[in-house]
Amino acid sequence: RDRSPSRGLGDVYKRQSECHAAIHKNIEVRFDSTSGGLFSALAERTYKEGGYVGGAIFNEDYSVSHFISNDKKDLAALRSSKYLQSNAEGFYKLVRQLLKSGEKVLVCGTPCQMAALRRFLVKDYDNLVIVDFICLGVNSPKVFRKYLDYLEDRYQSKIVYFKAKNKELGWRQLTSKVVFQNKQILYDTKDTSFFTIGYLGTKVYSRPSCYDCQFKGFPRMADITVADYWGAEHTVGKELDNDMGTSLVMLNSQKGKSYFETIKSTIIEKKVPFESILGGNRALVQSLDAPLVDRVSFYEDLDTMPFQDIAAKYIRRPIDILTWKRKLKNVLRFLWNIASVSRFNLPLYWKNIRYNLFCKQVKCSIVRGCLLYTSP
């Protein structure tokens, strides 16, 4: 298949990408971002120049659409992963209109979406920077909505806030934070979340095209590729990896390199060899594996069964098969970690105990390893 975005663009894409590990210097931005906050750094530069930034946002019903504006207030909605198929209806036309009127534009989307934008625009624009990300696969909005309905039924309250990859329990826990109207808070980790485990474990939630993705590898269609830098602990020091999220940045074109130079004052970065990034980011070059369950049966059941029954039939969570040794280990780990985090500060020690054992609004489980720590 022809993966070139269009004829006549010239050689604007380099086959060899320059790779960097990076984090935003603003700790609040980094904490609120999916990884290290690099998309925010890029977006902030565009806003500063009076330009427009486009990407995926949650709608009120937690469906996802592509959106663009020149208002920095929208950055909080644009940053962070959504993990869902987004509706890009009308988005490409609006981008073209802005570009033709001379506006500076930075857009972000999946590799297939950004390749489609390249093809739609026909030519490259000097006032356009395209960002994509290393994509494992996009998930079904229908599955996600059923998951949210299940949570609302379980907690008897409407969801008023949802954030994937919340970092209160650490970047590597892949925690979804869910806040309900009745003030209850759920921290759903990679070991407890039916949505995360279904996505990463069964691989049945994604689009059929994701199992044979035509936009893996090189050349990249975007000027810049961003991602979680999984495996950062093996290549960078604690200055860039303290479990708060580290970004991998791939500079795929001269335009991408030049734009990256303009944000260096707002980030901490280190150039890393290309070979070092593949171990934790196989999705850069490899399509999603085929589902581990019958996909046809799964979606037929999705139309007729409650989500909790779907989960019981198709999804096996690690916490559902905890041994007594694992439970004991989790309890001991909790006691050790709160002592370390509290730094032998007795009031803070009891604060951690209270949050995890006696706070009704916070749903944690010590024996299951789902914990919440507060620091001084």
Q: Where are these predicted regions, by residue range?
A:
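Single conserved hydrophobic/aromatic residue that forms the stacking wall/gate
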Residues: 2-13, 373-376
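Short cysteine clusters
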Residues: 7, 112, 210-213
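Gly/Ser/Thr-rich loops at beta-strand to alpha-helix junctions
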Residues: 33-37, 60, 107-117, 137-139
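Glycine-rich phosphate-binding "P-loop"
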Residues: 66-90
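Short, flexible loop segments at boundaries between secondary-structure elements
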Residues: 131-147
